[in-house]
From Swiss-Prot:
Taxonomic lineage of the native organism: Eukaryota, Metazoa, Chordata, Craniata, Vertebrata
Known glycosylation sites: 210
Any GO BP annotation: negative regulation of membrane protein ectodomain proteolysis
Function text: Complexes with metalloproteinases (such as collagenases) and irreversibly inactivates them by binding to their catalytic zinc cofactor. May form part of a tissue-specific acute response to remodeling stimuli.
Signal peptide: 1-26
Main localization category: secreted
Residues binding Zn(2+): 27
SUPFAM superfamilies: TIMP-like
Site (Involved in metalloproteinase-binding): 40
Keyword Zinc: yes
Family: Belongs to the protease inhibitor I35 (TIMP) family.
GO cellular component: extracellular matrix; extracellular space
Protein name per the record: Metalloproteinase inhibitor 3
Source species: Scyliorhinus torazame (Cloudy catshark)
Domain NTR residues, every copy: 27-146
Amino acid sequence: MVFSTTAALSLLLALSSMQLSEVSEACTCMPNHPQEAFCNSDIVIRAKVVGKKLLKDGPFGTMRYTIKQMKMYRGFSKMQQVQYIYTEAAESLCGVRLQVNKFQYLITGRVFDGEVYTGVCNFIVPWDRLTLSQRKGLNHRYQYGCNCKIKPCYYLPCFVTAKNECFWTDMLSDQGYMGHQAKHYVCIRQKEGYCSWYRGAAPPDKTRINATDP
């Protein structure tokens, strides 16, 4: 009986340890180019956080941020105005921490049951850290490229498997995934039907796009 109790306690501790490990390591995000973050989001807004409230405590709690929306870039079909942003309270579950009354943020998220949810795997960054190219991308360029696919390249050589793909090679540089392509380029379909990187001062038109490989 003593052996059984000891074994049961050991098993319980082991399972508890595994569960805690799973929770602490649950938040793993694949890098996203800002264009894909834009295209894969239901909502993309520029906003300032003006308040926060913990709705549910504990490891599976929810944090609600009250925001002042400055501009919406994507999501008009879902809602016209966003007042609250929801995220997991625990950082281990990909909850994001936003500063109140400090920054304007670019916030991307998904809509569930009429509410906007976001987390560290979404593209969230203080507005003043965005490059001019990224800001232009939000206004029109990223939308033009939503029918293209940005394919991360971690090791050379990389191979295109479809004509709608652009290689994302920032991970091969010292800057990592927020390198030159993420900061300055958008992947756009050309009139010939294939996608390639674009960078320019003027918005790309739909009939002729000057593509530039970074």
